[in-house]
Amino acid sequence: GYDNKKATDNAIKLHSDGKKWLHTGDIGYMTEDGTIYALTRGEAPRYGGGSLATLPMENRLADAEVEGIDDEFFVIVQDPEHHRCFLPYLFVVLEEGYTVDDIREKVNESLEDYMQPVDIIALPERPFFHFKTNRIGLIHDIEAGKFNK
């Protein structure tokens, strides 16, 4: 954390080679030529079991080819009831004539129990900020109750 010494000390660690390394918690890999690929942003455990990661969840859902979904992506939000645990929300852009109720059963059948979204929210289009999906904006919207029914 920028203004949190304890969080900074936990993230920046001195290794046995004498160099300081930043431990972000991100998950990825480096190829032999030194190219780094980030797959997901750290660990996000779900209360009751399972570790949430948007990319594998989105890939599984895309592979299921759920009829009625034009685009889908997950947002992972802190669980307000369980410290250090998270909840998945699924955002979808639906094909014309479909509703969230039309896709819900197939979505849930396509995902492991721990991956199943606490809510499926339809949007007219995927929101972007600086050419990336605006997950942070959606997290703020979820936390503010914008999508509460």
Name every feature range the model reports, one short phrase each.
Residues 4-8, 134:
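Acidic/polar helix N-cap motif
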